Amino acid sequence: MSEVQSPVPAESRLDRFSNKILSLRGANYIVGALGLCALIAATTVTLSINEQLIVALVCVLVFFIVGRGKSRRTQIFLEVLSALVSLRYLTWRLTETLDFDTWIQGGLGVTLLMAELYALYMLFLSYFQTIQPLHRAPLPLPDNVDDWPTVDIFIPTYDEQLSIVRLTVLGALGIDWPPDKVNVYILDDGVRPEFEQFAKDCGALYIGRVDSSHAKAGNLNHAIKRTSGDYILILDCDHIPTRAFLQIAMGWMVADRKIALMQTPHHFYSPDPFQRNLAVGYRTPPEGNLFYGVIQDGNDFWDATFFCGSCAILRREAIESIGGFAVETVTEDAHTALRMQRRGWSTAYLRIPVASGLATERLTTHIGQRMRWARGMIQIFRVDNPMLGGGLKLGQRLCYLSAMTSFFFAIPRVIFLASPLAFLFFGQNIIAASPLAVLAYAIPHMFHSIATAAKVNKGWRYSFWSEVYETTMALFLVRVTIITLMFPSKGKFNVTEKGGVLEEEEFDLGATYPNIIFAGIMTLGLLIGLFELTFHFNQLAGIAKRAYLLNCIWAMISLIILLAAIAVGRETKQVRYNHRVEAHIPVTVYEAPVAGQPNTYHNATPGMTQDVSMGGVAVHMPWPDVSTGPVKTRIHAVLDGEEIDIPATMLRCKNGKAVFTWDNNDLDTERDIVRFVFGRADAWLQWNNYEDDRPLRSLWSLLLSIKALFRKKGKMMANSRPKRKPLALPVERREPTTIQSGQTQEGKISRAAS
C-alpha cells in the first residue's frame, strides 16, 4: 500500500516560490522596481477627503490586526505601512496645504514644512536602522587559555574624585582573565600623587600626562605609545566592569580578525535626572536604553556600530592603522569608529551590559553633556561627512548620517512647539487645511508613527518621552547647533561631572528658565485662543473657528510637553553617596565572634539580599528583631562559583529585614565589596526589566509627572519608587556552627585575581 504523503504547508510553498523567483537573474531589481512603482502610486493617488478617511481607517484596522504578531516580518510590515501613510501625508502637505496669503505667512509655513521634512527623514532613517537587529550572541573563546590575547585596560581620568575611580580600577583588576595577559592602567591627565600611590597599592599601573592636550583622545593616544597589549579595553573612570567582561565580549574579536571594535551597552546603576526627578521616573526606561537596546543592535546589522567612548574593546592594530584616536572633534569615539570603518575595518555590538556607571546627577550636568555630544557629532558631519569620501557602504553611511543629524533636533523641536503661536498671536494660518483634512491625513500619520515606534521600541523607550527629552534640552542646543554648523572648529571637551549628593530638594532654574518662559508665552497664546472661542465664537468666520480650535489643541499639546520638561528641573534630594542597587543574592550571615576568639564567627543564618551598595546591604532573613545596638557579622556568598566573605555590622533588624554596613577597613575588603556589588557576571542582565510600551499609559505617566511639579516639598520620592514585594524565604535558621575569619566550611575563600 502506497504511503500517503502529507500536503506541503502553504507557507512553505509560498517561501519556495518566492525564493525561486528571487533566485532568477535580476529578480531583485525587478521586484524592487515594481515595489517602488507601487509605493509611488499609493502615495500620490488623488482621493477625496471621504475616500482618504476610509483608507486611513483601513490602515488603522490593518495595524491592529497585523500588529498582534511578534515576528520580525510583522515589524517590517508595520514600518512599511507607517512609511506609506507618512508619505501620503507628505504628499498632501506639499500639494494642498501651502496656500499662503502673505510673505510672512509663507515664510512661517515653509519653516514648519522644513521641520516636518526633517522629522520624516529621521523617521525613515530609524526604520532603516532597525529593520533587522542582529542580536549578536557571545562567541566562546579558544579552549586553550594560552591562545587568549593580551589586553590593556585603560581607565582615563582628568579631575574625577579618587573615590569614584578606585571602584573602576578594583573592578578591572578583578576581571577573570589570565593575570599574565592583562594590565590595568590609570591614565591620569591630572598627574595626582594620590592616584599614583593608589595604583601602587592595588596592583594597577599608572601613566600620568602633564599637558592634557586633545583631552580624552590625547590621553588615550599618549597611553597607546607606552603599552603593547593586543587589545585595549576602555572604561570611563566610573564604569565598573563585571568579572566576566572580557570572556563575554572578546570571543568575536579573536574569531574575526576584521573586527576592530566590540562595543557593549552603557548601563547606569544610578538614576538619571528624568528617572530621579519625575513622579513616574523609576518606572520609565532610562534615556539611553533606546540607543543601546534598539539602535546599536540595528546598526550592527549594517556593520555600523559606533564606538561610544567606554565599555568597548578595540584592536590595537586597527587603532594604529588610523594613527590613533581622532582628535579633530570633541566626540573622539564616534569619529574614531568612522575612520576605522573607512579603512575597511568592521565593528560589532553585543547587547549585554558587562559594566555599569554613574548617570549624570543633575539636570544642568545632563544638558551640558548632551551639548558636547551635539557639538561633536555636528563637527564630524562638517569635517568628515559620512556621505562623502570613500571606504563606506551605503548602509554604514546612512547609519552614521542618522547619528549625526539626529542632533539637529533642537531647531525642529522648537518650531513644532511654537507653531500654534503664529496664529494665536498674529493670525497667521500656516497650514491651510480643514479639521476633516487633518483628521484624514495628519492624525493617521501621527498614529502610525507613534504606534509603530511602540512596537519596535517595546520596553526600551516609551511613547512621548522622546519629545520630553528633546524639549528639555532644545533651547540650549539651538545655539550650539547653529554655531557648530557655521564654525565646526569651535568648542572644547568638557568632562561630565559624576558623583555627589544633594542635601535639599531644589528647583534648577538655570536648567529650566528657557522652557519656563516658553511655557508662559504658550499659556498666554492658549488663553487668547480660548477667549476668542468662548466670547467671540458667533462673530468668527467658519474657517477662523476651525483655525482657533486646531491651534488651541496644538498649543495644549505643546504646553503639556513643556511642563513635563520643566518638571525635570525639580531636583529631589540625593543624600546617599553610595547608590543602592537592587540585587537578590543568596547569602549566609555569621554572627558575632565567640568570646576569646575574635576571628571566629557562629550561628549561620541564610538570607537573600534586597539591595546592595558600597556602603552596605539589606538582607531578608529569619532573624529576631534587633534594636539594642550593632552586631558584628560576616556575610558569606558564592559568586560565579567562587566564595566570598565580607565583614559587616548589623545596624538593625525588623520584620525579617536586616540592614548591614560594611566594615571596609582595608583594600582587600574593598576589593571584595566591589566584586559583590558590581562584579557579578549577571549583575545587570535585568537592565531592561520594563513593561512593553503602551502609548496611552505613557501619556498618562507624563500627566502625572506634570502634576508632581506642584507637589509639596519632599513628597515625590516616597511615591515614585516601585514598591518591592517582600522576598519569601523557604529557609529556617540553622543550628549554631562556627567559621574562622577568612574561611568557609568548605575551605579558605579564594579572591578574584588582581
UniProtKB/Swiss-Prot annotation:
Q: Which of this chain's residues are annotated to bind substrate?
A: D236, D238
Asked whether the keyword Nucleotide-binding is assigned, the reply is yes
Which residue ranges does the record annotate as region Disordered? 717-754
Region: Catalytic subdomain A; residue ranges are: 147-240
**Which residues catalyse the reaction?**
D189, D333
The free-text function statement in the UniProt record for this protein reads: Catalytic subunit of cellulose synthase. It polymerizes uridine 5'-diphosphate glucose to cellulose in a processive way. The thick cellulosic mats generated by this enzyme probably provide a specialized protective environment to the bacterium. Binds c-di-GMP with a dissociation constant of 30 uM.
Q: What is known of its domains?
A: There are two conserved domains in the globular part of the catalytic subunit: the N-terminal domain (domain A) contains the conserved DXD motif and is possibly involved in catalysis and substrate binding. The C-terminal domain (domain B) contains the QXXRW motif and is present only in processive glycosyl transferases. It could be involved in the processivity function of the enzyme, possibly required for holding the growing glycan chain in the active site.
Identify this protein by name.
Cellulose synthase catalytic subunit [UDP-forming]
